[in-house]
Curated annotation (Swiss-Prot):
NCBIfam families in UniProt: lysS_arch (TIGR00467)
Gene Ontology cellular component annotations, sorted alphabetically: cytoplasm
BP-aspect Gene Ontology terms: lysyl-tRNA aminoacylation
UniProt KW Nucleotide-binding keyword: yes
Protein name as annotated: Lysine--tRNA ligase
Keywords, sorted A to Z: Aminoacyl-tRNA synthetase, ATP-binding, Cytoplasm, Ligase, Nucleotide-binding, Protein biosynthesis
Gene3D superfamilies according to UniProt: 1.10.10.350, 1.10.10.770, HUPs
Subcellular location, record wording: Cytoplasm
Organism: Halobacterium salinarum (strain ATCC 700922 / JCM 11081 / NRC-1)
Top-level lineage group: Archaea
Molecular function as annotated in GO: ATP binding; lysine-tRNA ligase activity; tRNA binding
This protein's record includes keyword Transcription: no
Length: 548
């Protein structure tokens, strides 16, 4: 492998932020303007957060290059002329609702195995094709993340002749193409042709070319069977002629063809490509096409709740679902981390991710006295790339505290509690308060989705039905009197709940259950003392006395 093509060469040494090191390597190649940053995907199942890896890595490198005064074009190719080789178990509609294959027109897919994605009817009936449906979801996800990326359809590029020149060149130099591919792939014999026509009779992609007329720009073919994993997609046997716009290049040739056609200067990709099609692609690019490959960057895949994303199986989370849980800058923060390290996107522990972002924000604004020099330098470099506008007056309510506020639907009470606990400054204006409280609904959704200790609703409107024995009623009255006379913090109130139960010889668990019944209409709930200490005193005392 040429030393410039090592995808692991960019170790980020000497740079606080990996995107700066990546931009350095891109500029070392003296690229023409605009600098082209690319990613790509083949349609499959449900587009999810993991599919945003290349888009978001490219976003940061593009931002750094623009900071340095360069014009950048960020593109994302949909390999939508690929043939459908199997049926996904899950799909997503344009609203991001994930459904089983049986809930839509499954026949649209099942009857078109072997056909290009853009020739398959949309199972939802809303887009021009299944390929277009998938691309629309990717574009929508990028838009939600605030990334200005241009979707490029391979089908359209073939149809408008964008790949015609490079395809013709490969067919004219087929011996060299075979020799290079044979270093990476078995079954490359003297009859191999790097072009897969689309059968004019059945519409399937076929791999059997019987004759080439490069001058005329046509191939002769036979529609034969296609191996697709553990199944065989039958060809129809038709013999026909196809132009170079009526088929596709095999992937190992299509990738370097994209680099040439789009003028790609930089492309991040997963380690599966780094150890597979990247070495062959650079070899084809340099030694068959005579091109300089783009600057590479390999990234580690991240998992979802400890397990690999699976689009077809539905183990995914969509971008719109993530943004119902997290503010956009927090999502960008996740992707700003070192791409060479494997990570887990843990929904259960999203509070930790938010806390990390909040910490960086405080460090940036000089509000973390214990910050190290490295922390301060990294925050100064990265934070401005995470937010759309830098606002020193912005208020962030701690995520788990926001989840506590989410236990009540009363917006005025949410603000009152947040102010009382010091999470909203006394001089905050209405817009600042409203912005700060948007985190509450996200934290509430996190609690609901994970069913954690914050997934409760305060029964404030009216007292829930209850039936307490005399000892429990007396202990509750005693607790109300304690609150009338004292001003305890959460832990002191928690301790008094224990003591009241003991004084009246009540089972501790049963007494807490009585409190949960009064305040949540549940038998269990959050840590009761700290929660009640955050509420207005009059309401808590009245409820403990069962008066409203």
């Amino acid at each position: 492998m040429h030393p410039d093509d090592d995808p692991y060469a960019d170790d980020g040494s000497g740079r606080l932020f990996w995107a700066d090191a990546a931009a350095d390597r891109v500029l070392d190649g003296d690229p023409e303007e605009p600098i082209v940053i690319k990613g790509g995907i083949s349609p499959s199942g449900v587009p999810h957060l993991g599919n945003m890896n290349e888009i978001m890595r490219g976003y940061f490198v593009a931002a750094v290059l623009r900071e340095r005064g360069h014009e950048v074009r960020q593109v994302f190719t949909s390999d939508d002329r690929d043939p459908l080789r199997g049926l996904p178990r899950k799909l997503a509609d344009l609203d991001g609702e994930v459904v089983a294959l049986g809930d839509v027109n499954a026949g649209a897919l099942g009857q078109n195995l072997g056909a290009p994605y853009t020739e398959i009817p949309d199972p939802f009936g809303c887009c021009d094709s299944y390929g277009a449906h998938f691309s629309n979801l990717i574009q929508s996800s990028a838009d939600r993340l605030g990334v200005d990326v241009e979707m490029v359809s391979n089908t359209e590029t073939y149809a408008n002749g964008g790949f015609e020149e490079v395809t013709r060149y490969l067919l004219e130099h087929v011996t060299a193409a075979r020799d290079v591919l044979g270093e990476y792939q078995d079954k490359v014999d003297e009859e191999y042709v790097p072009f897969n026509p689309i059968c004019e009779a059945c519409g399937k992609v076929t791999e059997t070319v019987t004759d080439v007329d490069a001058d005329a720009g046509t191939v002769e073919y036979v529609c034969t069977d296609m191996d697709a994993g553990d199944q065989t997609i039958e060809g129809c046997g038709h013999e026909g002629t196809a132009t170079l716009r009526e088929g596709k290049l095999p992937w190992r040739f299509e990738w370097p063809a994209q680099w040439r056609t789009l003028g790609v200067d930089y492309e991040p990709f997963g380690k599966d490509h780094a150890e597979g099609s990247w070495p062959s692609g650079t070899d084809i690019s340099r030694n068959v096409l005579g091109d300089e490959p783009p600057t590479p960057m390999v990234y580690e895949w991240f998992t979802l709740d400890g397990e690999p994303f699976s689009s077809s199986a539905g183990h995914v989370i969509l971008v719109q679902d993530v943004l119902a849980l997290l503010e956009l800058p927090v999502v960008r923060y996740f992707f700003s981390k070192d791409p060479r390290r494997a990570r887990d996107f843990s929904i259960e522990h999203l509070d930790q991710l938010v806390d990390e972002f909040d910490r960086m924000e405080r460090v940036y604004f000089g509000e973390a006295a214990d910050a190290s020099e490295d922390e301060r330098e990294r925050a100064a470099r990265v934070y401005p790339l995470l937010v759309d506008d830098i606002d020193a007056d912005r208020v962030r309510i701690p995520f788990t505290f926001a989840a506590v506020l989410g236990m009540t639907e009363d917006s005025a009470l949410r603000e009152e509690i947040a102010r009382r606990e010091g999470h909203i400054p006394a001089d905050a204006d209405a817009d600042t308060v409203a912005d700060a409280l948007t985190r509450v609904e996200r934290a509430r959704e996190w609690a609901r989705r994970t069913n954690n200790e914050f997934n409760y609703r305060l029964a404030r409107a009216e007292i829930p039905a209850h039936d307490f024995d005399d000892a429990t009623a007396a202990a509750l009255d005693e607790l109300a009197a304690f609150l009338d006379d004292e001003d305890p913090d959460g832990e002191a109130l928690q301790g008094e709940i224990y003591e009241a139960a003991k004084r009246h010889d009540i089972d501790i668990g049963a007494f807490f259950a009585a409190g949960y019944r009064l305040f949540f209409d549940e038998d269990q709930g959050p840590k009761l003392g700290p929660f009640l200490a955050k509420l207005d005193r009059e309401f808590v005392v009245t409820r403990l006395r069962r008066e409203g």
